[in-house]
């Protein structure tokens, strides 16, 4: 059986899928609170930058992969309007349910779909914009997922990948202390789950750096790939176009 990484552990691919699912079933109910605590609210600025770069317009078709609690889907639905089509998707039922309920509470009615990014159930050349925020690092076959995202994009459509990345070297030691000491403490204190937030720190370290992810997107067939470092490289937004 093929091996892969779950944080720093080496596990079978099927076991990773189960473990990742377990993490997000566990954190779903506290996801928004923990995002605010862990990032000091910065995740809102990172998402706002992504929304601005996506430049969704009335009538656009948008696929929000790993949509979680629906921050991007909410913004895109407002911009795409009644003539547009925004799909809020996630592979995790608990996250999808929390996101769906949150969108409804905000008065946003948009399709919600349980979706594996490695097997996207849409035809070729369908979407104007595809986004994945803080989801790619949890995927087992990132290359397959990126290829699928490209497949469903229309010509001239764009893929935006917002993800934790490699922090600038002068901040690395402090960031390591925060990641491996503070994050698990916050998880234990506010969500009664230190292990899930320890996995978060480990999964960030195992994720490809900015240049490697840029190359992966190019190898998936995307063109004009560029990235923006946010908060000293704690997060990066990669953007690629299908020509």
Swiss-Prot record:
Keyword Magnesium tagged: no
Any Pfam family hit: Ubie_methyltran
Pathway noted in the entry: Quinol/quinone metabolism; menaquinone biosynthesis; menaquinol from 1,4-dihydroxy-2-naphthoate: step 2/2; Cofactor biosynthesis; ubiquinone biosynthesis
Leading EC class: transferase
Catalysed conversion reaction: a 2-demethylmenaquinol + S-adenosyl-L-methionine = a menaquinol + S-adenosyl-L-homocysteine + H(+); a 2-methoxy-6-(all-trans-polyprenyl)benzene-1,4-diol + S-adenosyl-L-methionine = a 5-methoxy-2-methyl-3-(all-trans-polyprenyl)benzene-1,4-diol + S-adenosyl-L-homocysteine + H(+)
One GO term of the biological process aspect: methylation
Coiled coil: none
Name used for this protein in its record: Ubiquinone/menaquinone biosynthesis C-methyltransferase UbiE
Gene behind this protein: ubiE
